[in-house]
From Swiss-Prot:
One of its GO terms (molecular function) is ATP binding. Belongs to the argininosuccinate synthase family. Type 1 subfamily. Its EC number is 6.3.4.5. L-aspartate binds at residues 117, 121-122. This is Argininosuccinate synthase. One of its GO terms (biological process) is urea cycle. It catalyses: L-citrulline + L-aspartate + ATP = 2-(N(omega)-L-arginino)succinate + AMP + diphosphate + H(+). Keywords: Amino-acid biosynthesis, Arginine biosynthesis, ATP-binding, Cytoplasm, Ligase, Nucleotide-binding.
Amino acid sequence: MSKEKVILAYSGGLDTSVAITWLKKDYDVVSVCMDVGEGKDLDFIHDKALKVGAVESYVIDVKDEFATDYVLVAHQSHAYYEQKYPLVSALSRPLISKKLVEIAHQIGATTIAHGCTGKGNDQVRFEVSIAALDLNLKVIAPVREWKWSREEEIYYAKENGVPVPADLDNPYSVDQNLWGRANECGILENPWNQAPEEAFGITTSPEQAPDMPEYIEIEFSEGVPVSLNGEVLKLADLIQKLNEIAGKHGVGRIDHVENRLVGIKSREIYECPGAVTLLTAHKEIEDLTLVREVAHFKPIIENELSNLIYNALWFSSATQALIAYIKETQKVVNGTAKVKLYKGSAQVVARKSPSSLYDENLATYTSADTFDQDAAVGFIKLWGLPTKVHSEVQKSAK
């Protein structure tokens, strides 16, 4: 009699490898690893899952879908959770959940498993997303259920023939995708400890970065980055290339104590060279092209959208409504930003746009000025009228 199938979100690490062994007693385990741009050896991960005991092993390249359907939303909405974190991990979880559900439907599985602990945000993101897509799917969290210490987990792995990674003594917990790299644990858990250089993986120390600045040009079409230094690229490829270029200059290092969804504070080290560079450049093109009222209101939407995505609500109607608003604002966001990369900073030093609302003849103080300064007197009188009336009423009341 065949066992029920379970779909396991598989990373290739110790937790999910042990999970295969733990689950296969009661299920036929189908492992699924998604490539969101973390740069792992996918062939190795595929084979390892089968070696440990999975009956099937899927490795799926979703970088392009991740870039266009998820990262682009964060990019166009300048998504920084608590004004610092560009939502690196939070963005990939809805997509991973979506693919897990799709595969479950394809092979007739009724259960999905993940390798999250009981104190992180990701358990919530996976389970809320899966429930939003299919309420009938059961979710198992082996790591949360077994409550083993690291030593007990290693002992179980060795007893059951699960390969123990050679870098297991590495104190850090790292998650990486196209949009950046997140690092926690070890010495980083004490917020008074400066993050050592070994905690960083995709950026050069600003002190060790090149002594000469590098200038790059990023072109946007309706808010979408379409070319880098004149070369037209797919979004995923453009982000990867920017990660290399800006990372070399130490751009995008973020040290942040954040408020987790589960109620605790956590110290995180993020490296987001491509993200920070793109977000900086995009904002400058918006400054040229958005009317004042949209430019002033959009940050309110951006902040709320960042919170919703961080807090596991990608598939909520509120999130989708705010995404629709953001997309509407991007129709005029066309242009090119010139960015100076130098020792940890990404600074826009020039910008141009065919949709620009900047009129040099109105802005200039030279003889080319076309601004009607005589109109200022009447404007000031009407603009200040409510304040004048209020002041007069207050005086008469005394």
